[in-house]
């Protein structure tokens, strides 16, 4: 097991709400805007790989693929399990159920 996989597992285990992200990724910017809009940005640990060298970004993405089954940016993990990407947030927002869904996972009271 690579050090990247071990560290990915540790980060996910340490943070009930986790997001693999990159500063250059428009979908990640959207997800972060949701956390800010709902004032839960302090609850979601965002691991931003955007400033790392390309080869290191790829190693992290491979590690998260192995750990949670997704290498997408953003990858949102709740209580150690893959929850979704920005697509999930868009779907819930379009249906008008975003806050309800985030309440179900304990992110909103």
UniProtKB/Swiss-Prot annotation:
Its main location: cytoplasm. Coiled coil: none annotated. This is Glutaredoxin-8. Pfam families: Glutaredoxin (PF00462). Induction: Strongly induced by the exposure to arsenic which causes glutathione depletion. Keywords: Cytoplasm, Disulfide bond, Electron transport, Redox-active center, Transport. It comes from the Eukaryota. Glutathione-dependent oxidoreductase with lower activity compared to the other members of the glutaredoxin family. The disulfide bond functions as an electron carrier in the glutathione-dependent synthesis of deoxyribonucleotides by the enzyme ribonucleotide reductase. Monomer.
């Amino acid at each position: 097991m690579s050090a990247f996989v071990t560290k990915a597992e540790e980060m996910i285990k340490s943070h009930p709400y986790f997001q693999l992200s990159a500063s250059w990724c428009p979908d990640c910017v959207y997800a972060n805007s949701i956390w800010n809009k709902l004032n839960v940005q302090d609850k979601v640990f965002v691991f931003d790989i955007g400033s790392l060298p390309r080869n290191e970004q790829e190693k992290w993405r491979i590690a998260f693929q192995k750990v949670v089954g997704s290498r997408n940016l953003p990858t949102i993990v709740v209580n150690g399990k893959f929850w979704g990407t920005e697509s999930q947030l868009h779907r819930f927002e379009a249906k008008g159920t975003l806050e309800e869904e985030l309440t179900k996972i304990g992110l909103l009271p």
